[in-house]
């Protein structure tokens, strides 16, 4: 069902990358609602409602917010460097060609369980860094949740996270 609403854009954002565009799925109210219910259900039966859903910049924000509204819990944003005001905690990590930094605001930090949410899992570098960021901020990571898992993409070194997904491409 969801695969019909996920289009592939060849050579975007760079040559050799086939981008999975979720815009048609997000525009379809019934499919989007169904995806949120299915995503949340992957954890709800095991851990219940986390204290927070951590959305990864930027499309993870969409899913984390919708999950929080539907299932309960708050939303915390894991943002790209320089996008977060105030008192922050940060983690830097390596990309295939360079490095990046994620930041999280310290507002409301005091522990609790989080589920980390993103739209797509490819190499796992950003998801792994977000786990480190959440733990550095004092949260217990209950799990990782993505809409799409690109299982055919090689993972970063030492990637051993439990990730649950609604759609997988092998």
Q: Where are the predicted features?
A:
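PRPP-dependent phosphoribosyltransferase catalytic core
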Residues: 4-5, 128-170
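Short, glycine/charge-rich flexible loops or terminal/linker lids adjacent to PRPP-binding catalytic cores
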Residues: 73-115
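Conserved acidic residues
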Residues: 51, 112, 142
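Generic enzyme active-site microenvironment
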Residues: 55, 116-117
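Short Gly/Thr/Asp-enriched flexible loops that form oxyanion-binding sites at enzyme active sites
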Residues: 62-71, 131
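Short glycine-rich phosphate-binding loop at a beta-alpha junction
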Residues: 48-57
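Active-site-facing substrate-recognition patch
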Residues: 1-49, 105
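Conserved G/P- and acidic residue-centered "switch" motifs that form tight phosphate/ATP-binding loops
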Residues: 119, 124
